[in-house]
């Protein structure tokens, strides 16, 4: 039995090759892989000794040869194939172990040139993977170091890999080469200014119990590109498995949290904030956000942009919550909160990044793609269009409300005072309805003066402004654009 090994990621390859040799396999290798194996004391055959042809073009051509692909593709049960191999002096190759040039890592480097990117496009590797994967009934194809131990265990146990494992590895290899080609195609198309095709790559995080409703099947996938404030890369420290609706709500909460640099907390229900506040620290921000709407937060989701301390944990523990998210939890906070077995605690990466991100929204039979809105222009005094100028406190509250209302379902109105929401009017078919809801909530807390109001859309009529003025609102921020 013969194995051909040619890897860029050399993790575990020496141990794998040594294991194959101990099981009686011959090991063939190329360039750097051969050098590493030989220096590590593994008996290895140079690929050039198999092909009878040297590596040429700075290593661009080394395995593209009939003695490689004939040995991989020949069917062991086809007399014509066997005859062709004998006549041409070609021997079987029973395993290919290949991982590809690091194209993704190369193009991710700042300042990388196109020439550098092109030199990291693997040609021979994908060709060998595809040949071996096509002939999976007889050939084992390996593209992931994580599979080395499983393969060695099967050979030790059965004398060779099982047909089932070879089929699984074949599917994995084709997935790997498809992702690799899509990545290269995307890069080249961007350089060429072409956008009529869109290739997407997502990996399964977990199957979900069901979707938005119990009769809908669902799964959770993540993109190959790690980004901050992403639930897909969160670490769950406690609680039940996340549901489809949990994930949607948690994602909406994280979008709000990333708006703030100062200590901040938001409570959220059904993808709308019900209470949000800035504070001195996590405990203070939570207290203010909770007091903004003690009723709606019941069974909700909480997200903070500061580590959860014991003090904050003890304040949150008495309240029934589904999820608490933060950049971290102190050991003392975990001790307090983990006694609630169903409470999901998620540690979410929250480092700042200016990297451009895409937002994908599915429509029936299609997909909308836009840049993710990561820019919120601060509210400043020079934006004022009235003779009366806002105070510094009002400006701070207007800026706070502007960042919150961006994430409320339209028509959206948010009423704010002293760095916390007092009322949130969401999702009404007319703007006055949302204003009435938000102001009613603020007045129910006994606050009837010193308010500011933020609107996610312009006012087509003066009804909202008149209502606000009569309800204790002293300043308004809105995008403008009304012809009236």
Protein language model annotation of sequence segments:
Residues 145-146, 150-198:
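Non-catalytic interaction/clamp surfaces of large macromolecular machines
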Residues 1-50:
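N-terminal glycine-/serine-/threonine-rich phosphate-binding loop
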Residues 38-40, 54-61, 150-154, 333-337, ...:
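Short, charged, surface-exposed secondary-structure boundary motifs
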Residues 76-123, 130-133, 383, 387-392:
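Active-site/ligand-binding-proximal alpha/beta "capping" segment
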Residues 25-28, 41-54, 96, 140-141, ...:
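Short hydrophobic/aromatic-enriched beta-strand-loop microsegments
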Residues 1-3, 180-484:
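ATP-dependent carboxylate/acyl-activation modules
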Residues 128, 135-148, 169:
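Mobile "lid/hinge" segments at catalytic clefts and subdomain interfaces of large enzymes
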Residues 32-103:
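Glycine-rich nucleotide/cofactor/substrate-binding loop typically near the N-terminus or early
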């Amino acid at each position: 039995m013969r194995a051909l090994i040619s890897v860029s990621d050399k993790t575990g390859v020496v141990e794998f090759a040594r294991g194959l040799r101990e099981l009686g396999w011959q090991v063939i290798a190329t360039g750097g892989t051969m050098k590493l194996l030989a220096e590590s004391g593994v008996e290895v055959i140079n690929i050039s000794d198999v092909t009878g042809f040297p590596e040429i073009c700075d290593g661009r051509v080394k395995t593209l040869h009939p003695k490689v692909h004939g040995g991989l593709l020949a069917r062991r049960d086809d007399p014509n194939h066997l005859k062709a191999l004998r006549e041409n002096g070609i021997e079987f190759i029973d395993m290919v172990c290949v991982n590809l040039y690091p194209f993704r890592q190369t193009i991710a480097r700042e300042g990388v040139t196109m020439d550098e990117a092109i030199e990291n496009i693997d040609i021979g590797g994908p060709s060998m993977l595809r040949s071996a994967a096509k002939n999976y009934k007889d050939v084992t194809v390996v593209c992931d170091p994580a599979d080395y131990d499983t393969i060695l265990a099967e050979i030790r146990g059965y004398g060779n890999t099982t047909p089932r494992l070879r089929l699984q590895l074949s599917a994995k290899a084709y997935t790997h080469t498809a992702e690799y080609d899509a990545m290269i195609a995307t890069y080249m198309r961007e350089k060429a200014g072409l956008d009529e095709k869109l290739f997407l790559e997502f990996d399964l995080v977990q199957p979900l119990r069901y979707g938005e409703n119990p009769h809908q099947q669902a799964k959770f996938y993540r993109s190959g590109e790690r980004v901050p404030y992403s639930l897909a890369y969160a670490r769950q420290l406690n609680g039940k498995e996340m549901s489809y609706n949990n994930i949607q709500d948690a994602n909406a909460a994280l979008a709000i949290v990333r708006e703030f640099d100062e200590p901040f907390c938001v409570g959220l229900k059904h993808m709308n904030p019900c209470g949000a506040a800035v504070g001195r620290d996590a405990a203070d921000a939570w207290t203010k956000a909770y007091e903004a709407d003690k009723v709606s937060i019941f069974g909700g989701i909480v997200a903070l942009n500061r580590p959860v301390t014991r003090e904050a944990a003890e304040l949150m523990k008495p309240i029934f919550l589904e999820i608490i998210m933060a950049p971290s939890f102190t050991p003392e906070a975990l001790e307090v909160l983990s006694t609630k077995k169903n409470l999901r605690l998620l540690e979410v990466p929250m480092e700042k990044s200016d990297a451009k991100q895409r937002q994908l929204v599915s429509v029936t039979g299609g997909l909308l793609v836009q840049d993710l809105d990561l820019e919120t222009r601060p509210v400043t005094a020079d934006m004022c269009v009235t003779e009366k100028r806002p105070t510094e406190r009002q400006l701070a509250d207007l800026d706070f409300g502007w960042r919150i209302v961006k994430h409320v379902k339209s028509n959206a109105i948010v009423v704010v005072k002293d760095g916390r929401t007092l009322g949130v009017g969401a999702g009404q078919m007319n703007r006055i309805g949302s204003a009435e809801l938000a102001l009613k909530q603020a007045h129910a807390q006994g606050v009837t003066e010193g308010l500011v109001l933020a609107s996610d859309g312009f006012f087509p009529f003066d009804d909202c402004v008149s209502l606000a003025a009569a309800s204790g609102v002293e300043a308004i921020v809105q995008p403008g654009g009304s012809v009236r």
